């Protein structure tokens, strides 16, 4: 009987924790039934794209005009953007005898309904504007009728291409394993047998240096299941990472990526700048952005059916607008919501390039990056769309010992960040639990007073509706093992995503508020403040009708958090709206070193009266 009860409980946990509201059709491209596509080209219909050559001024993004003429217009006609431009069955992966190859083997990288042009339904003529990014291959556009569920190919356009499809693009900065290191990761079409990748960099008044880059990629066979192995597959190109070492603290550096071809010529990227990290414990102004579950948007309005990540562009644009006042960003899981449609990783890195090329863009693993049955993930859902962590671990760098175990520590000036991986076991006795305790225990709080815990799923507290139904207002098994660590090592704030809203607790320990103050905390540590900040872009999650006393601020809207450390004693917390950047919730912590040392409940080792 006990065994049957345990099996039922585990099934419930998987269902609640893996699906939640996230199991919906959350990737626009997944709505297209690729296997149902048939061919019925209309001799009087045509579609034409211009300009033919893109990026002639060095751009990696360009707008194109798509002219359509269709003598039989319908409200469900749509235009798909395909890359590579040749997308018929001749490009299909080999199939066994039991599997019938579809007419088209891959999903488009984006699509738009023809009726987006106001006169299309009246005249059958339309001009659509698409924004294309350099994705290492040419493009063609296809006109379909029959909607997304029963599409029929009517006409195919000419091909267009960037002047150099292989060019190095979309740099992503990350903290290295040492405080004076910064890594640069980027994407190109150059394999190491064709060109040697490197980064050239310098600070003002010094000679430039070159750092070699390692090159990685992944293949269809690296994916765990569909759609990543099937219609969602697209060659990711080559991902290069260089480590810039021996950086001086808090100085501005200029860099660019290069590929030296076999003939000795060099293909260069644009120039970029960043500010190096402060020395651990350095007393200087330090500003941190934290959010989860942003996903991506389309500036051209394509994929317009999909309102799954309606806040994504607003969050991105607010960060770009305030970039001069940001030092580092943490995107804590559910990064792209590509869900097995590999082309969307390029789309996302292009969207965040203005941010990620300028400040370290640190990521954590979420269910939409990692989860797949029988793949070693803690949850058995299919939220990754068959990616099982591979694109996230390859496309972004982070200072983990093992990329497949997505947990790491990061030091930035007066901050210590302990980043957990909720898609692997975190409970007491696990390898990750040991890491978390080491990360929390090893920080010198005199030098780094601000101790931050980060995880994707809510291992702490949330009044989200489905956590309320589950009964404990947390990810099942979430805080039972960890709360004694947060208390013992006096974690100031714990951040989570996964739940798509904003919520802040009181300083809390074992379900009890340890401090009734709401906006100004001072003196000795009493308990960890838990913050859900998963409302950066994806569809919003509703709150439970129950509101425990520990929940002191909730917001059903899109936003992100900014932490500002003024010195070793003063920290400002701000929750900002993505729509306008306005501060909607805030508090301050003032805590001197003697307050950090002060013994509170369950936070100090046993003492002796011996002299």
From Swiss-Prot:
Cofactor(s) recorded in Swiss-Prot or TrEMBL: Fe cation; Zn(2+)
Keyword Zinc: yes
Domain of life: Eukaryota
Residues that hold Fe cation according to the record: 293, 334, 337, 500
Expression sites (tissue/organ): Expressed in roots, stems, leaves, flowers and siliques.
Keyword terms, alphabetized: Glycoprotein, Iron, Metal-binding, Secreted, Signal, Zinc
InterPro entries (UniProt xref): Calcineurin-like_PHP_ApaH, Fn3_PAP, Metallo-depent_PP-like, MPP_PAP, Purple_acid_Pase-like_N, Purple_acid_Pase_N, Purple_acid_PPase_C_dom
A single GO cellular-component term on record: extracellular region
Xref: SUPFAM superfamilies: Metallo-dependent phosphatases (SSF56300), Purple acid phosphatase, N-terminal domain (SSF49363)
GO molecular function: acid phosphatase activity; metal ion binding
Glycosylation sites: 263, 271, 314
Cofactor binding notes: Binds 1 Fe cation per subunit. Binds 1 zinc ion per subunit.
Signal peptide per UniProt: 1-18
Localization annotation: Secreted
Binding site for Zn(2+): 334, 367, 456, 498
Pfam families in the record: fn3_PAP, Metallophos, Metallophos_C, Pur_ac_phosph_N
CDD domains, sorted: MPP_PAPs
Chain residues that bind substrate: 367, 498-500
Gene3D superfamilies in alphabetical order: 3.60.21.10, Purple acid phosphatase-like, N-terminal (2.60.40.380)
Family, per entry: Belongs to the metallophosphoesterase superfamily. Purple acid phosphatase family.
Subunit description: Homodimer.
Protein name: Probable inactive purple acid phosphatase 27
Source organism: Arabidopsis thaliana (Mouse-ear cress)
């Amino acid at each position: 009987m006990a065994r049957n009860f345990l099996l039922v409980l585990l099934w419930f946990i998987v269902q609640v924790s893996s699906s939640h509201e996230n199991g919906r059709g959350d990737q626009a491209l997944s709505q297209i039934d690729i296997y149902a596509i048939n061919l019925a080209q209309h001799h009087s219909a045509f579609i034409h794209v211009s300009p033919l050559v893109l990026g002639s001024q060095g751009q990696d993004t360009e707008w194109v005009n798509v002219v359509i003429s269709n003598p039989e217009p319908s409200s469900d006609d749509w235009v798909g953007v395909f890359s590579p431009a040749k997308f018929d069955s001749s490009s299909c992966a080999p199939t066994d005898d039991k599997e019938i190859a579809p007419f088209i083997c891959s999903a488009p990288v984006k699509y738009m309904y023809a009726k987006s042009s106001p006169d299309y339904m009246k005249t059958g003529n339309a001009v659509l504007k698409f924004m294309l990014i350099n994705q290492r291959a040419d493009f063609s556009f296809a006109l379909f009728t029959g909607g997304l569920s029963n599409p029929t190919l009517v006409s195919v356009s000419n091909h267009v291409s960037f002047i150099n499809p292989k060019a190095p693009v979309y740099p992503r900065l990350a903290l290295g394993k040492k405080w004076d290191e910064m890594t640069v990761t980027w994407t190109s079409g150059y394999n190491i047998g064709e060109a040697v990748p490197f980064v050239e960099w310098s600070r003002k008044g010094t000679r430039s240096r070159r750092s070699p880059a390692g090159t990685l990629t992944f293949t269809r066979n690296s994916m765990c299941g569909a759609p990543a192995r099937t219609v969602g597959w697209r060659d990711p190109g080559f991902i290069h990472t260089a480590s810039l070492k021996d950086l001086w603290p808090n100085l501005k550096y200029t860099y660019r990526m290069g590929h030296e071809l076999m003939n000795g010529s060099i293909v260069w990227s644009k120039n970029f700048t960043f500010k190096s990290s402060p020395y651990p414990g350095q007393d200087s102004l330090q500003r941190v952005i934290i959010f989860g579950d942003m996903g991506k948007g389309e500036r051209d309005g394509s994929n317009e059916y999909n309102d799954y990540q309606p806040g994504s562009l607003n969050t991105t644009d607010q960060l770009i607008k305030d970039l001069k006042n940001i030092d580092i960003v943490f995107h804590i899981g559910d990064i792209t919501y590509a869900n097995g449609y590999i082309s969307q990783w390029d789309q996302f890195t292009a969207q965040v390039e203005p941010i990620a090329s300028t400040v370290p863009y640190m990521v954590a693993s979420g269910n939409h990056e990692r989860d797949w049955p029988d793949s070693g993930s803690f949850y058995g859902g299919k939220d990754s769309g068959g990616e099982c962590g591979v694109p996230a671990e390859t496309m972004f760098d982070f200072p983990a010992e093992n990329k497949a175990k997505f947990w790491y520590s990061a030091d930035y000036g007066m901050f210590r960040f302990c980043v957990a991986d909720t898609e692997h076991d975190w409970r007491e006795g696990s390898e990750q639990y040991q890491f978390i305790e080491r990360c929390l225990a090893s920080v010198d709080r005199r030098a780094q007073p601000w101790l931050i815990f980060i995880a994707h799923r809510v291992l702490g507290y949330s009044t989200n509706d489905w956590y309320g139904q589950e009964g404990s207002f947390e990810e099942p098994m979430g805080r039972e093992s960890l709360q004694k660590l947060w208390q013992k090592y006096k974690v100031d704030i714990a951040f989570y995503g996964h739940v798509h809203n904003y919520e802040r607790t009181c300083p809390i320990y074992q379900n009890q508020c340890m401090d009734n103050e709401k906006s100004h905390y001072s003196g000795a540590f009493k308990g960890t403040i838990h913050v859900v900040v998963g409302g950066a872009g994806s569809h919003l999650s509703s709150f439970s009708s129950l509101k425990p006393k520990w929940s002191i601020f909730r917001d059903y809207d899109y936003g992100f958090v900014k932490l500002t450390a003024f010195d070793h004693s003063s920290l400002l917390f701000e929750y900002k709206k993505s729509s306008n950047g306005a501060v909607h919730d805030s508090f301050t912590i003032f805590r001197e070193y003697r307050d950090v040392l002060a013994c509170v409940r369950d936070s100090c080792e046993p003492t002796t009266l011996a002299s």
